């Protein structure tokens, strides 16, 4: 049986994204997922689309710390890219219910992350 522990699920989610492994994401993310970052709110489809857009620049995620309390987990990790941004420190606050992530809040330095978006836009324009 799959773990329903928030810490384990959060760790698995960040690892799957960093490995560009979308298959486990379907089971880890609840259909009613709400994801928030940079003033935007996305549903599961929108979140997966956003992740797919970033994956060409993502080399890996390096998890630094995972904290959990009940159904909540906090993952601090470096989003390591092949862009001039290099590694960008990120924090994701996750809520898990019935073994699936129902809420994500992503915190990051938008200035440090800007080169990632700029270089992805340049690649798409080619």
Predicted regions and their residues:
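C-terminal and inter-domain tail/linker signature
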Residues: 1-126
């Amino acid at each position: 049986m799959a773990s329903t522990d928030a810490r384990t699920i959060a760790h698995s989610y960040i690892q799957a994204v960093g490995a560009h492994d979308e298959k486990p994401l379907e089971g880890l993310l609840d259909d009613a997922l709400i994801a928030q970052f940079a003033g935007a709110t996305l549903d599961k489809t929108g979140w997966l689309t956003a992740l797919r857009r970033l994956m060409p620049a993502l080399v890996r995620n390096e998890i630094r710390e995972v904290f959990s309390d009940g159904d909540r987990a906090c993952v601090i990790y470096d989003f390591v890219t092949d862009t001039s941004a290099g590694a960008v420190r990120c924090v994701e606050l996750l809520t898990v219910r019935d073994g699936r992530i129902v809420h994500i809040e992503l915190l990051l330095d938008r200035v440090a992350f800007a080169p990632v978006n700029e270089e992805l836009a340049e690649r798409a324009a080619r």
